[in-house]
Amino acid sequence: MNLKRMLAGCGAAAALVLAPLSAPTFADAPSAPTGVPAAVPLSDTTKVANWQKLQYGMFMHFGVYSVYGGYYNGHRQGMGYPEQIKAWEHIPTDDYLLKAKDLAANFDASAICKTVHDSGMKYLMITSKHHDGFAMWDTKTTDYNIVKQSNYGKDPMKELSTECNKLGVKLAFYFSIIDWTKQTPEPYGNVNPIDEELMTGTIKPQLTELLTNYGPIAELWFDMGGPTAEQSQRMAQWVHELQPDTMVNSRVWNKAGDFEVGGDNSVTTDFHMGPWESIRSIYPACWGYCSWANRDESAKSYKERELVNNLIGTVASGGQFAYNIGPKGDGTIDAFDSGVVTEVGQWMARHPDAITGARPTWFPAPSWGKIMTKGNDLYFFPEQWSTGQTLTLPSVGGHVTAVSVDGTDRSLDFTQDGTTLTVTMSGENPEPNLRPVVKVTFDAAPTYVPTQTVTAVDGATISSEQFFGRASALRYSGAQAYDAYLVNKTDKAITD
């Protein structure tokens, strides 16, 4: 890859004029382009690259709302997420604190971190404070916290930090910018302005505690509120001053974050450049625990396959994937919910290199599924398995030495016709309940061969057909942005 340009707007111009460029120096050109490494590289910024390596984590909404489980005074909450039940059901604070007494009665940080680890996840992101303002750590900023108000009386964030560190699981914090102990509860929209007293009297000291007392924090996930651009910059700066390697999400608002996040439960299957993360809950209607969710055994295989598909679709499209589970009020995870994530963890263990440590590729997404790469291998994730049907991938450079059903000794027939690779599926579906994986092995790292190439010289005009673009996670004034990549015949870098 040798040149990158940002193209903003809904469509690209018919031609791009790249001038002036310093005269590039080329080695002797081969007779045909050999392509570029198929793997989309990690960010060249160390902290971003380290975060991208995490790939897959557990999001966990846990607080006083978990004790309610979506019910108040014997009736099911009629509107809104259950973690916002205090506002939707107009629950008085004194009543709310009565429920807090029962919070985390059976909380076991070791068991939670083990579930995360055994599920193939690399980080745990938990709600340190949701919109209700109830702090889930031992804070000196308010008595409205789990240590002071629950019979549990301990700091679950400290316990999670200790136990997850033992297993190599990174810790991340969700932090709501709004605080219903100081603002009128408004669950209908993201309209709460942030006054200076809240900024300096609550948000700053609470962030200081969270980023000082619990070890390295992989990401700080802000949410809600209507801060000014200056306030957004200050919040991001506070985080970076305390922990320079902590990634800040885009919901700090006003383009002050380090990475983009979409809407709740928004999972894209389209490739996007730039650091980004998708979040999805096991039950899209609730992020905190909802006791009424369908946990019938007949629904389990559907949830497992949905999770696998969302995981593959996100990481193969260049993003991180955080999957949410809401523990019960006592701090335990429902057996159905933990069973879904651990089953997918077993699938990942059967295919240890297909996701973990693998990278998305430059290949345009084929109609039959998704692709990842690691080392000298490509990994195909076909959506369907049908004996005799083929998986065709154009623009493949390099020499294929073997194709097999990943995790087995079953080989598959294949042909290479120029830059077109065709694999024929055969035998029974190796993963009838989840997603099959095909391993394609090369004699060196696989390459992507663009269908159009151009030799770049000063003042060269390059048509839209001669670059390949990938949508950026960033948007500018509501328009989609694109990262455009150009490759010259010799695959040597052009430097400005």
Tell where the protein language model's regions lie, with residue ranges:
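Repetitive helical segments and hydrophobic/amphipathic motifs
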Residues: 13-14
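C-terminal segment of classical bacterial N-terminal signal peptides
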Residues: 17-25
